[in-house]
A protein has these predicted regions:
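Conserved acidic segment of CheY-like receiver
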Residues: 11-23, 28-32, 60
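Short hydrophobic/Thr-rich beta-strand motif most characteristic of the beta2 strand and flanking loop
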Residues: 36-43, 51
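Acidic catalytic/metal-coordinating carboxylates
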Residues: 44-47, 70-73
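Active-site beta3 strand of CheY-like receiver
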Residues: 55-61
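Receiver (REC) domain active-site loop signature in two-component systems and cognate sites
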Residues: 66
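Basic, amphipathic DNA-recognition helix from helix-turn-helix-like DNA-binding domains
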Residues: 76, 80, 85-149
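A structural micro-motif at secondary-structure boundaries
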Residues: 148-176, 189, 206, 243-256
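DNA-binding patch around the recognition helix
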Residues: 170, 215-217, 221-256
Length: 256
């Protein structure tokens, strides 16, 4: 399962690749297998879902345009039950597709035609963020908790978990890493380019690249804010980017 300790490194992952183009499946299967990954191949969305449910992969790479079920439908159904990392493959001109996929819960996207090496780099970055993103950090008996509390929201950075009124908030590894970055410099803005580089590991080459940040901010607000349309925690810094509200005396240590 993607929660396992094996996800702390890029080697030895179980990766589900779904694409209706046989040449892309062949190239990715060859490249990823050579790196020691177990690669599961699907040629349509229905097959991808069946393989996902039966194999619990560590990572999913999905083409958007597939027969039977498109990539959007697959992302939506996976996200209803899992925070497994998802990378979408989209056509060059389909900016709207990229935004839709991110809104549904994809962690990142690659534009076709793409370099297999670049995809491998994206996989490494996404898996670093996901490796402890499911709460696999310090467990019972570990070091004192590093917890930030703001109102009824508490964020445990050791366990990489967030709670509102003692109810666990489901965050993907990328969403938690984004939250962690903003809180690390609360009250100070980050530009979209800074966030993209720190969390996703690459520098924006096109304006649309920074929409990855905007969409993830929107998803994070929908999970953390009482009123996402009028956020009080994750604020917009006009002309700059985003910031987390200034935190004062909100770090708690583990009680007796």
């Amino acid at each position: 399962m993607h929660q396992s300790g094996e996800a702390t490194r890029p080697e030895g992952l179980k990766i589900l690749v779904a694409d209706d183009e046989a040449n892309i499946r062949r190239i990715l299967e060859t490249r990823l297998s050579m790196q020691g990954h177990e690669v599961l191949m699907a040629c349509n969305g229905a097959e991808a879902l069946e393989l996902f449910r039966g194999s619990e992969p560590d990572l999913v790479v999905l083409d958007v345009m597939m027969p039977e079920l498109d990539g959007f439908a697959v992302v939506e159904r996976i996200r209803a039950q899992s925070e497994v990392p998802i990378i979408l493959l989209t056509a060059l001109g389909d900016v709207a597709d990229r935004i839709t996929g991110l809104q549904l819960g994809a962690d990142d996207y690659m534009v076709k035609p793409f370099s297999p090496k670049e995809l491998e780099a994206r996989i490494r970055c996404v898996m670093r963020r996901a490796s402890t993103g499911q709460g696999g950090g310090v467990g019972a008996g570990g070091s004192a908790a590093n917890v930030v509390v703001v109102g009824d929201l508490s964020v445990d950075f050791n366990r990489r978990q967030a709670f509102r009124a003692d109810e666990r908030i489901r965050l993907t590894g990328m969403e938690f890493s984004l939250l962690e970055l903003l809180v690390s410099r609360s009250g100070e803005p980050f530009s979209r380019g800074e966030i993209l580089k720190e969390v996703w590991g690459y520098t924006p080459e096109r304006h649309v690249d920074t929409r990855v940040v905007d969409v993830h901010i929107s998803r994070l607000r929908s999970k953390l804010e009482d009123d996402p349309a009028n956020p009080e925690l994750i604020l917009t810094a006009r002309g700059t980017g985003y910031l987390f509200q200034r935190i004062v005396d909100s770090v708690a240590s583990e009680g007796p």
